[in-house]
Protein backbone atom coordinates (compact mmCIF):
# COMPACT_ATOMS: atom_id res chain seq x y z
CA UNK A 1 0.00 0.00 0.00
CA UNK A 2 1.29 3.45 -0.94
CA UNK A 3 1.97 5.97 1.82
CA UNK A 4 -0.67 8.35 0.39
CA UNK A 5 -3.30 5.61 0.50
CA UNK A 6 -2.34 4.82 4.09
CA UNK A 7 -2.76 8.46 5.07
CA UNK A 8 -6.14 8.66 3.29
CA UNK A 9 -7.32 5.58 5.15
CA UNK A 10 -6.13 7.09 8.42
CA UNK A 11 -8.02 10.34 7.67
CA UNK A 12 -11.17 8.35 6.91
CA UNK A 13 -10.78 6.45 10.17
CA UNK A 14 -10.33 9.72 12.04
CA UNK A 15 -13.48 11.09 10.43
CA UNK A 16 -15.38 8.04 11.63
CA UNK A 17 -14.02 8.55 15.13
CA UNK A 18 -15.00 12.22 15.07
CA UNK A 19 -18.54 11.48 13.90
CA UNK A 20 -18.94 8.89 16.64
CA UNK A 21 -17.44 11.08 19.34
CA UNK A 22 -20.76 12.41 20.62
CA UNK A 23 -22.14 8.87 20.86
CA UNK A 24 -19.02 7.68 22.66
CA UNK A 25 -19.10 10.57 25.13
CA UNK A 26 -22.67 9.70 26.08
CA UNK A 27 -21.47 6.35 27.42
CA UNK A 28 -19.16 7.99 29.96
CA UNK A 29 -20.00 9.50 33.33
CA UNK A 30 -20.35 13.28 33.23
CA UNK A 31 -18.45 15.50 35.62
CA UNK A 32 -20.51 16.46 38.67
CA UNK A 33 -18.89 19.83 39.38
CA UNK A 34 -19.29 21.42 35.97
CA UNK A 35 -17.87 24.74 37.11
CA UNK A 36 -14.47 23.11 37.63
CA UNK A 37 -14.45 21.32 34.28
CA UNK A 38 -11.81 22.47 31.82
CA UNK A 39 -12.67 23.25 28.23
CA UNK A 40 -11.65 20.65 25.68
CA UNK A 41 -8.96 22.96 24.31
CA UNK A 42 -7.46 23.42 27.78
CA UNK A 43 -7.40 19.67 28.38
CA UNK A 44 -5.65 19.06 25.07
CA UNK A 45 -3.13 21.80 25.87
CA UNK A 46 -2.22 19.96 29.07
CA UNK A 47 -1.69 16.72 27.15
CA UNK A 48 0.49 18.53 24.62
CA UNK A 49 2.61 20.15 27.33
CA UNK A 50 3.16 17.30 29.81
CA UNK A 51 5.88 14.69 29.39
CA UNK A 52 4.48 11.81 31.47
CA UNK A 53 1.27 10.44 32.93
CA UNK A 54 -0.25 7.33 34.46
CA UNK A 55 -1.70 4.64 32.20
CA UNK A 56 -4.40 2.51 33.85
CA UNK A 57 -5.11 -0.97 32.50
CA UNK A 58 -6.84 -4.18 33.53
CA UNK A 59 -3.95 -6.20 34.94
CA UNK A 60 -3.35 -9.70 36.28
CA UNK A 61 -6.33 -11.35 38.00
CA UNK A 62 -8.40 -8.30 36.99
CA UNK A 63 -6.58 -6.00 39.41
CA UNK A 64 -6.17 -2.42 38.14
CA UNK A 65 -2.63 -1.84 36.90
CA UNK A 66 -1.55 1.80 36.75
CA UNK A 67 1.91 2.53 35.37
CA UNK A 68 3.75 5.87 35.00
CA UNK A 69 4.83 6.32 31.39
CA UNK A 70 6.15 8.94 28.97
CA UNK A 71 4.09 9.67 25.87
CA UNK A 72 3.40 12.00 22.98
CA UNK A 73 -0.01 13.44 22.01
CA UNK A 74 -1.00 13.83 18.36
CA UNK A 75 -4.43 14.41 16.80
CA UNK A 76 -6.54 12.99 19.64
CA UNK A 77 -4.26 10.02 20.10
CA UNK A 78 -1.61 9.15 22.67
CA UNK A 79 1.47 7.19 21.69
CA UNK A 80 3.77 5.19 23.97
CA UNK A 81 6.70 2.83 23.58
CA UNK A 82 7.42 -0.33 25.51
CA UNK A 83 9.66 -3.35 25.83
CA UNK A 84 8.52 -6.36 23.84
CA UNK A 85 7.05 -8.15 26.85
CA UNK A 86 5.82 -7.43 30.36
CA UNK A 87 2.80 -6.77 32.55
CA UNK A 88 1.74 -3.72 30.53
CA UNK A 89 1.88 -5.56 27.22
CA UNK A 90 -0.07 -8.55 28.57
CA UNK A 91 -2.74 -6.24 29.99
CA UNK A 92 -3.17 -4.38 26.69
CA UNK A 93 -3.52 -7.61 24.74
CA UNK A 94 -6.11 -8.88 27.22
CA UNK A 95 -8.33 -5.79 27.33
CA UNK A 96 -8.21 -2.74 25.07
CA UNK A 97 -10.07 -0.40 27.44
CA UNK A 98 -7.80 2.04 29.26
CA UNK A 99 -7.53 5.44 30.88
CA UNK A 100 -4.66 7.90 31.12
CA UNK A 101 -4.16 10.63 33.71
CA UNK A 102 -1.90 13.68 33.63
CA UNK A 103 -1.48 16.03 36.60
CA UNK A 104 -0.34 19.45 35.45
CA UNK A 105 -0.52 21.25 38.81
CA UNK A 106 -0.67 20.08 42.43
CA UNK A 107 0.17 22.95 44.77
CA UNK A 108 -0.42 22.01 48.40
CA UNK A 109 -2.05 24.75 50.50
CA UNK A 110 -1.37 23.58 54.09
CA UNK A 111 -3.29 26.33 55.86
CA UNK A 112 -6.38 25.62 53.73
CA UNK A 113 -6.11 21.81 53.92
CA UNK A 114 -6.41 21.55 50.18
CA UNK A 115 -4.44 21.61 46.94
CA UNK A 116 -4.66 23.86 43.91
CA UNK A 117 -4.78 21.16 41.23
CA UNK A 118 -5.30 20.87 37.50
CA UNK A 119 -5.46 17.48 35.79
CA UNK A 120 -6.78 15.58 32.79
CA UNK A 121 -8.13 12.05 32.35
CA UNK A 122 -8.55 10.39 28.95
CA UNK A 123 -10.60 7.25 28.34
CA UNK A 124 -10.25 5.16 25.22
CA UNK A 125 -9.04 2.06 23.42
CA UNK A 126 -5.41 1.02 23.42
CA UNK A 127 -3.60 -1.16 20.88
CA UNK A 128 -0.18 -2.58 20.13
CA UNK A 129 0.90 -1.36 16.69
CA UNK A 130 1.70 -4.64 14.98
CA UNK A 131 4.45 -4.59 12.36
CA UNK A 132 4.34 -8.20 11.15
CA UNK A 133 4.26 -8.53 7.41
CA UNK A 134 5.93 -5.21 6.72
CA UNK A 135 9.44 -4.52 5.56
CA UNK A 136 12.00 -3.14 8.00
CA UNK A 137 13.99 -1.32 5.32
CA UNK A 138 13.78 2.33 6.41
CA UNK A 139 13.90 3.40 2.77
CA UNK A 140 11.01 1.12 1.75
CA UNK A 141 8.51 1.03 4.60
CA UNK A 142 5.06 -0.51 4.34
CA UNK A 143 2.46 -1.93 6.68
CA UNK A 144 2.31 -1.41 10.43
CA UNK A 145 6.06 -0.92 10.53
CA UNK A 146 5.61 2.56 9.08
CA UNK A 147 3.30 3.59 11.92
CA UNK A 148 5.73 2.12 14.44
CA UNK A 149 8.59 4.09 12.91
CA UNK A 150 6.47 7.25 12.90
CA UNK A 151 5.73 6.79 16.62
CA UNK A 152 9.43 6.34 17.39
CA UNK A 153 10.23 9.56 15.55
CA UNK A 154 7.45 11.50 17.28
CA UNK A 155 8.63 10.33 20.70
CA UNK A 156 12.26 11.08 19.89
CA UNK A 157 11.50 14.56 18.61
CA UNK A 158 9.26 15.22 21.60
CA UNK A 159 11.99 14.57 24.15
CA UNK A 160 15.13 15.41 22.18
CA UNK A 161 14.16 17.76 19.32
CA UNK A 162 16.43 18.86 16.48
CA UNK A 163 18.79 15.89 16.72
CA UNK A 164 17.76 13.99 13.60
CA UNK A 165 21.04 12.14 13.09
CA UNK A 166 21.20 10.88 16.67
CA UNK A 167 17.54 9.89 16.56
CA UNK A 168 18.00 7.99 13.31
CA UNK A 169 20.89 6.03 14.83
CA UNK A 170 18.84 5.25 17.95
CA UNK A 171 15.94 4.05 15.82
CA UNK A 172 18.16 1.83 13.69
CA UNK A 173 19.70 0.27 16.79
CA UNK A 174 16.61 -0.14 18.92
CA UNK A 175 13.40 -0.17 16.90
CA UNK A 176 13.29 -3.96 16.60
CA UNK A 177 13.45 -4.24 20.40
CA UNK A 178 10.50 -1.96 21.14
CA UNK A 179 6.75 -1.98 20.79
CA UNK A 180 4.76 1.06 19.73
CA UNK A 181 1.39 1.59 21.40
CA UNK A 182 -1.55 3.75 20.27
CA UNK A 183 -4.30 5.05 22.57
CA UNK A 184 -7.39 6.31 20.69
CA UNK A 185 -9.11 8.86 22.93
CA UNK A 186 -12.88 8.39 23.16
CA UNK A 187 -13.61 10.71 26.09
CA UNK A 188 -11.50 13.49 27.62
CA UNK A 189 -12.14 15.48 30.78
CA UNK A 190 -10.09 18.06 32.64
CA UNK A 191 -10.69 19.51 36.08
CA UNK A 192 -9.15 22.22 38.25
CA UNK A 193 -9.50 23.40 41.83
CA UNK A 194 -12.34 25.83 42.47
CA UNK A 195 -9.78 28.33 43.79
CA UNK A 196 -8.10 28.41 40.37
CA UNK A 197 -11.48 28.97 38.72
CA UNK A 198 -12.25 31.87 41.05
CA UNK A 199 -8.79 33.37 40.64
CA UNK A 200 -9.09 33.38 36.86
CA UNK A 201 -12.56 34.93 37.01
CA UNK A 202 -11.30 37.67 39.33
CA UNK A 203 -8.54 38.48 36.84
CA UNK A 204 -10.91 38.71 33.87
State each model region's role.
Residues 46-47, 91-92, 155, 183:
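A generic structural signal for nonpolar/aromatic side chains embedded in well-ordered alpha-helices
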Residues 48-50, 63-64, 112-113, 176:
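Short solvent-exposed loop/turn micro-motifs enriched in small/polar/acidic residues
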Residues 3, 35-36, 44, 87-90, ...:
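Anion-coordinating catalytic cores for phosphoryl-, nucleotidyl-, and glycosidic chemistry
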Residues 52, 66-68, 97, 117, ...:
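Broad gene-expression machinery/nucleic-acid interaction feature
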Residues 2-34, 107-204:
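Charged, gly/pro-rich active-site loop segments
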Residues 26-54:
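Short, basic/aromatic recognition patches
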Residues 87-117:
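Helix-adjacent hinge/juxtasegments
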Residues 50-84, 100-101:
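Short beta-strand segments
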Amino acid sequence: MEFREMMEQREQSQACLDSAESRQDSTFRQMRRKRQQLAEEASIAILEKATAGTLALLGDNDYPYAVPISYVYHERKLYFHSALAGHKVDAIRKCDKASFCVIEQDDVQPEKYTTFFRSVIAFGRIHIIEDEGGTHDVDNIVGGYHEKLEVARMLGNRYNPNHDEALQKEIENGLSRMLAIRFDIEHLTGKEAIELVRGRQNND
